[in-house]
Amino acid sequence: MTLTALTDWTNILNECIVSIPAVLTVPTPQNIGKLIVILNQLLAFAQAGFLNQQQQADLTSIIKNLITILTISPLNFIVLTNELQTLVNNLLSLINLFVIDNTTRQVQTQLIQNIILPLAQLGPTGATGLQGSTGATGLQGSTGATGLQG
């Protein structure tokens, strides 16, 4: 992999680290559009000839799925996060195929892992319902053992 290609790859990953949390927390058309632009950059990278035909087909399919998911309204976060996880898994497997030194590989792996951190930190954010009524009192337990005599 050339230094220019590695720089492009790193820039795309860094943009994903910023853009994905933005879409997940504030899914505005602007944030979604920015992520689609980044995914198209990743698509161009995938088709630049660094990957074999099968790897290129797999990554292209995942990216196109993500772009499709992002263009459907309302945004389905479950489907989006599942496909983002698929993307991260694919990127992690690809980084091991790049001809780069181990230090660079570790840095790239960390960048890819940082893409998935926002997904792991997501929790339910919707309104909660009313608290249910208190349950019935349970049966009384058996009497405990007698203590030591003083």
Located regions from the model:
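Collagen/collagen-like triple-helix recognition
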Residues: A120-G150
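Extreme N-terminal targeting and regulatory segments of eukaryotic proteins
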Residues: M1-Q41
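Alpha-helical bundle protein-protein interaction modules that mediate dimerization/oligomerization
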Residues: A5, I17-P27, A48-A127
